[in-house]
Amino acid sequence: MGSFKGHALPGSFFFAMGFWWTMKNILKSVYKRQTRTCYLNSKTLLRRTEIWEGVVVLLMSLTGIAGEQFISGGPALILHKDGQWNQILGWHHTTMYLFFGLQGITQIICFTTNVLPLSSSKLMLSIAIFVETFMFYNHTHGREMIDIFVHQLLVFVGTFSGLVAFLEFLVKNNALLELLRCSLLMFQGTWFWQMAFVLYPPCGSATWNLSDIQNKMFLSMCFCWHYASILILIGVKYALANWLVKSRLRKGCTSEVGLLKHADREQESEEEV
């Protein structure tokens, strides 16, 4: 992960999954508020969606593991070499991907068999996030100030995300907790991208002074801006989903009224005959 791509890849994974889960939870919530029957709550559709989510998470994790181990001179699954640990930071990242892969497998098992309770996938998600946080907490020894600081902020978001995911495991079907967890996952995703630009600026970009206190102050403010942007994005998505559902229900009601009028006319014509 010691490169721009190495930070952009997990950032894209976190943001994509958080974005999808946000849309799914918003649509479920809006449908529940607008109508008693919700197609999104169909057991068959729900199971299929959860299974495919597990498959996608597993594929993302395998992609991350392959990238860490075999691309750009990775350790290639060799942990100890020439009397010392072989690229131990790469193994940290592999461990993080491993636990998210286990979460994907758990979700697939939960929704394809009756071996595990459905809430096990939420518990495994919480564990995976805590493992990610633990890895990054022990990731920055001996580095420069800004490098340590941006990782500390990631650990802060990860710890909060893990706690919310665990609360979601304890408190079933809480829409606010679900949205909070999704927003924090998206937050981790955007912050991974910010770390990529700070620590490994692309060619042609200005290099950050990693020992400048003013850069630290700016990144503190930038950190808050990231989450503000995510909250605004969620608000826009909620308003859009609410408008789409209302317009769809309005069309449904109009078509039902049209069918009733057509039936009344047919009945009147039959009576005249």
Swiss-Prot record:
It is found in: Membrane. It holds the Pfam family DUF716. GO terms for cellular component: plasma membrane. The chain crosses the membrane at residues 8-27, 55-79, 108-131, 153-171, 217-236. The keyword Transmembrane applies. Keywords: Membrane, Transmembrane, Transmembrane helix. It is a multi-pass membrane protein. Belongs to the TMEM45 family. PANTHER family: EPIDIDYMAL MEMBRANE PROTEIN E9-RELATED, TRANSMEMBRANE PROTEIN 45A. This is Transmembrane protein 45A. It comes from Mus musculus (Mouse). The gene is Tmem45a.
